[in-house]
């Protein structure tokens, strides 16, 4: 327990907050060609590589991912959720934060149904998370 005198001489240190999705906290000023500290909830980017990755130890699968170059110049690895996708090398995608626990280095998700990314086909439950449209009611 510090004395009052010790606190006067050297105050309490603020805790440093470390972002879980740092690429979303940087903007880019194309006129000045410099990065800015403007955070955004989503960012647009172009796929540079699309592939599959194996998860960490207890799990086994081929998880789909894309390497994305964002509009602020940062390149990140993003997870492609849902069954099946239409992404290729120059597809324009929208990413959001949110890591995938069993994939190393994947801190972002691609938003299905945004820009070049199609929604998941034949999806009936949790449609909003996968960009699936409401099916038309069958005629009697």
Curated annotation (Swiss-Prot):
The modification 3-methylthioaspartic acid is found at residue 102. The keyword Flavoprotein does not apply. GO terms for molecular function: rRNA binding; structural constituent of ribosome; tRNA binding. It comes from the Bacteria. GO terms for biological process: translation. The keyword S-adenosyl-L-methionine does not apply. Keywords: Methylation, Ribonucleoprotein, Ribosomal protein, RNA-binding, rRNA-binding, tRNA-binding. CDD domains: Ribosomal_S12. Gene3D superfamilies: Nucleic acid-binding proteins (2.40.50.140). With S4 and S5 plays an important role in translational accuracy. Interacts with and stabilizes bases of the 16S rRNA that are involved in tRNA selection in the A site and with the mRNA backbone. Located at the interface of the 30S and 50S subunits, it traverses the body of the 30S subunit contacting proteins on the other side and probably holding the rRNA structure together. The combined cluster of proteins S8, S12 and S17 appears to hold together the shoulder and platform of the 30S subunit. Belongs to the universal ribosomal protein uS12 family. Part of the 30S ribosomal subunit. Contacts proteins S8 and S17. May interact with IF1 in the 30S initiation complex. This is Small ribosomal subunit protein uS12. The gene is rpsL.
């Amino acid at each position: 327990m510090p004395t009052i005198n010790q606190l006067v001489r050297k105050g309490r240190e603020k805790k440093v907050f470390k972002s879980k999705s740092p690429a979303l906290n940087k903007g880019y000023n194309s006129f000045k060609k410099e990065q800015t500290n403007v955070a955004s909830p989503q960012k647009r980017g172009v796929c540079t590589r699309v592939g599959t990755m194996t998860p960490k130890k207890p799990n086994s699968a081929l998880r789909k991912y894309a390497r994305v170059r964002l509009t602020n110049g940062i390149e990140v690895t993003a997870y492609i959720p849902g069954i099946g996708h239409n992404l290729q090398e120059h597809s324009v995608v929208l990413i959001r934060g949110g890591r995938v626990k069993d994939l190393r280095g994947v801190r972002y998700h691609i938003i299905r149904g945004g820009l070049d990314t199609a929604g998941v086909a034949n999806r009936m439950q949790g449609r909003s998370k996968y960009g699936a449209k409401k099916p038309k009611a069958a005629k009697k």
